[in-house]
Amino acid sequence: YIYSLLLILSKKKIDSNVIHGDPKLSNFLFDIQYKYVVSLIDLDTVSSGFCVIDLADCIRSISNLAGEEPENIEKVVFDINSVKYFLQGYFSIFNKNKSYSFRFLPEFIYLIIFELTIRFLIDFLQSNRYFEIKYETHNLFRSEVQYRLLTSFLVQIPKLSNELHDIGISSSSTFVSDVQKFV
């Protein structure tokens, strides 16, 4: 699937836009009183890229209610309800028909979680050169968190596909049906 996604990107079937580049939950400022997002912060990552990948990374972050550094790793799950409400809000503002790329959202969520799992693991194996750490096995722990999120996500793909369908986006049926065979 990674090769297929890269092929889609290389054939320019997905539009490039200005993206945030790191839309994790901790980079959102919230108005607590009115309960809405005021702004994205940490703008050093803004660049040209693919909106669907930024959206996938945002979903990766908001779906894990235990957080990036949970006290109890057992609580790491892909929370489909958080994603459902986020997508309803997102697509109530953003024109879902504007981009062909949204049909590949499950694949890109898979890709971003898988990529982070591997990046944290590689950094741990290479003596923690890239990501800042608080303790020696910090990146190994981060990799485990992402791996747990990935395995939970795989189980939730059919539900995610249904949620996308409910808001008018047909997801790529091949990926969803292939995942169902293995889960």
Regions found by a protein language model. Give the residues of each.
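ATP-dependent phospho-/nucleotidyl transfer catalytic cores
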Residues: 1-20, 25-39, 129-134, 148
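Conserved helix-loop functional segments at active or binding sites
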Residues: 1-8, 43, 61-64, 92, ...
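Secondary-structure capping and boundary motifs in well-ordered enzyme cores
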Residues: 15-20, 47, 109-114, 142
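Catalytic activation segment of kinase domains across protein kinase-like and atypical kinase folds
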Residues: 26-67
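Active-site activation/catalytic loop segments of kinase-like enzymes and analogous catalytic loops
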Residues: 52-95, 111-130
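All-alpha amphipathic helical-bundle segments outside canonical DNA-binding/catalytic cores
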Residues: 97-109
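ATP/Mg2+ or Mg2+-diphosphate-binding catalytic cores
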Residues: 115-183
